[in-house]
Design a protein with these regions (language model features):
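A short helix->beta-strand "capping" segment at the edge of beta-propeller domains
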Residues: 23-36, 319-322
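A short beta-strand motif characteristic of beta-propeller blades
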Residues: 25-31, 68-76, 124-131, 170-182, ...
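Beta-rich, blade/repeat-based domains predominating
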Residues: 32-49, 54, 77-101, 131-149, ...
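Conserved beta-strand positions in repeat-built beta-propeller and related beta-rich domains
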Residues: 50-55, 89, 95-110, 149-155, ...
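A short loop-to-beta-strand structural motif that recurs across blades of beta-propeller domains
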Residues: 58-60, 113-116, 158-161, 206-208, ...
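Short loop/turn segments that connect beta-strands within beta-propeller blades
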Residues: 63-67, 119-124, 163-167, 211-216, ...
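Asp-box/WD-like beta-propeller blade repeats and closely related beta-sheet repeat scaffolds
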Residues: 109-146
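Beta-propeller blade signature
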Residues: 111-121, 305-323
Length: 324
């Protein structure tokens, strides 16, 4: 049986739109170096694009006007490890990041999943919060209008929450509602639209919605009924008041837009053809950047034939999405 740690790497998570003209933005953002294996990207209102790396255990930033990422938050900063989801909360000047210490398949992490908070301008560490359930894997992050932070725990199939002003994470939704942990459904991408949290499962290709109650507690989890199937969904971001942009790693990879109305949704394909495995998307003005993680290379089994293909650059590519 595939281990939760090995499975999550198949998953590989937002920011406010920027008032930046599409013509001023590069077509490709490159992350120099080998074995970067990025899992998520986000963007801030100054035009920066921020990228997390699984293997290098650090966070990169593409400065406004540049097309090349530079190391911004080095590995080991305040204990930062394998970096998955990143999310820029511009309202609080905070970059949230998922950190995991991954070991060999079948071996529990030596350190439980941790949600980090960094200063969005300086990169200085603000705080970190350990996941409440053991053997957790922090995958992706979203923030609601009140400032509450939500993150997906892939291995435990839970959504955890950090209340605004809180000092500890708590389990907010789960209890088998997204699938049993033993089934390795991989709870992955997450986004907030109004008073609803949306989350997807990579391996079972499902999208779920959870109402946020007036008291902040989670309502009943429901699977979103889509007008056509999605395939291996990964990172997604809120796009306007009622839509999400979502990357799908199945069927050759694609970027889709889903118009949501509670527990129903209409899927529109924006672009197809991401052969290196799309893992995340962020929006800068009217431009979306789709990040490809090349995680199939990272997941090559021990003893498998050597890959003689020349290394490809790690990159995020632009696609016009217009205004929400």
């Amino acid at each position: 049986m595939t281990s939760p740690i090995r499975s999550v790497l198949f998953a590989s998570l937002g920011a406010l739109p920027l008032t930046v003209g599409a013509a001023s933005l590069p077509d490709t953002l490159t992350i120099p170096g080998e074995k970067i294996f990025p899992e998520s990207l986000t963007s801030s209102t100054d035009g920066s694009v921020i990228i997390g790396s699984i293997s290098q255990k650090q966070i990169y930033r593409v400065k406004p006007g540049s097309d090349t990422a530079e190391v911004w938050i080095p590995a080991g900063t305040d204990g930062l490890n394998n970096t998955f989801g990143v999310f820029a909360d511009n309202r609080t000047n905070t970059l949230y990041a998922c950190s995991n210490l991954l070991g060999p398949p079948g071996v529990a992490p030596a350190v439980n999943a941790t949600l980090y908070a960094f200063d969005l301008k300086s990169g200085a560490s603000k705080a970190h919060y350990v996941f409440p359930t053991g053997k957790g894997i922090c995958n992706d992050i979203a923030v609601d209008a009140q400032g509450n932070v939500y993150a997906t725990d892939t291995s435990n199939m839970e959504i955890v929450r950090l209340k605004k002003g809180g000092s500890a994470l708590e389990v907010w939704a789960g209890n088998g509602d997204f699938g049993k942990p033993a089934d390795h459904g991989i709870l992955d991408g997450i986004a907030v639209l109004g008073n609803r949290v949306y989350a997807n499962t990579l391996m079972t290709s499902k999208l779920f919605t959870v109402p946020i109650g007036a008291d902040g507690n989670a309502g009943a989890v429901a699977e979103v009924q889509l007008d056509h199937e999605i395939s291996r969904p990964d990172g997604m971001r809120a796009f306007g008041k009622s839509d999400v942009l979502i990357v799908e790693s199945g069927n050759g990879g694609r970027l889709s837009r889903i118009a949501l109305n509670g527990a129903t949704g209409k899927v529109t394909t924006i672009k197809e053809g991401y052969p290196d495995g799309p893992v995340s998307v962020t929006v800068v003005g009217t431009t979306a950047y789709v990040l490809e993680g090349q995680l199939a290379t990272l997941l090559r089994k021990p003893g498998a034939p050597a890959d003689t293909t020349p290394p490809k650059p790690f990159k995020a590519t632009a696609v016009q999405v217009g205004k929400p």
